Amino acid sequence: AGLESGEIDQETLIEDTGEIVIDQYRYGNWYFDQYGKTEGEINLERALARSNDIFFYRLGEKVGVDEIVSWASKMGLGERTGIELPGESEGLVPTRLWKERTTGERWFLGNTYHLSIGQGDLTATPLQIARMTLAAVSGRRCQVSLLQDSEVECVDLGISSKNIEIVKSGMRAACATGGTAFSFFEFGPYVLCKTGTAQHAGQTSDEVLPHAWITVAYPGDNPEMILTVMLDSAGEGSYEAGPVAKEILGRWQEVE
């Protein structure tokens, strides 16, 4: 959303301050919370590689909730994928109107911060995240099917090839030395990935472990497979979901 709206480009720098405090509310970055350190001024590629919340909080503030919601919907969040399985959830992309109708409250900047990092009231299935990942690295939103030989229709989202390459570069860096997905360091530039750690709504991190996420695109130059792993209440994505995804990808390579 930030790239396509023109709010940022590859060179735009945002300072990682470690935390943002608004009245009694605090929004922190994991690196500061765990180690007391900040990243300085970073661009989008570095922010993706390091999973830097402060960058995306500030970016979300620049872009605005409506633009974020628009692109989330374009990339398939908040709707069923249509896979041939019963009981699929459509998930939820919260909007200003949704919050007003559901809670009777207006939308606050803190809600935008949460939405910008995929938390708060946003909900999504692993399959939706896989489809969104495909859209991010290819610019296409595709149908999903269990049938190997089925004809899958894809819609071109009109994302510029330059912006796609910027995102891929950041996801490539996330799997390389210095990134958050240390399980994939040995794969070098051949894998794109993004780790995630999703907290339970309404609960603090010491009450229950967060959900561990990672989404992977392989091979990195022209992805043919998207792999998304979510482990319920397992901990951090880097430590828990990453090794599982690595094992699955390794087995897939053996039979490829």
What are these regions (language model features)?
Residues V152-V155, V244-E256:
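Short, gly/Ser/Thr-rich active-site loops of penicillin-recognizing serine hydrolases
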Residues D232-G235:
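A generic structural motif
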Residues A1-G2, I248:
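Hydrophobic residues on the short alpha-helix immediately C-terminal to a glycine-rich phosphate/catalytic loop
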Residues M132, G178, A241, W252-E256:
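Intrinsic structural disorder
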Residues I129, G237-K246:
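Short, charged, low-complexity patches
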Residues G2-V229:
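Beta-lactam-recognizing serine transpeptidase/beta-lactamase-like catalytic domain environment
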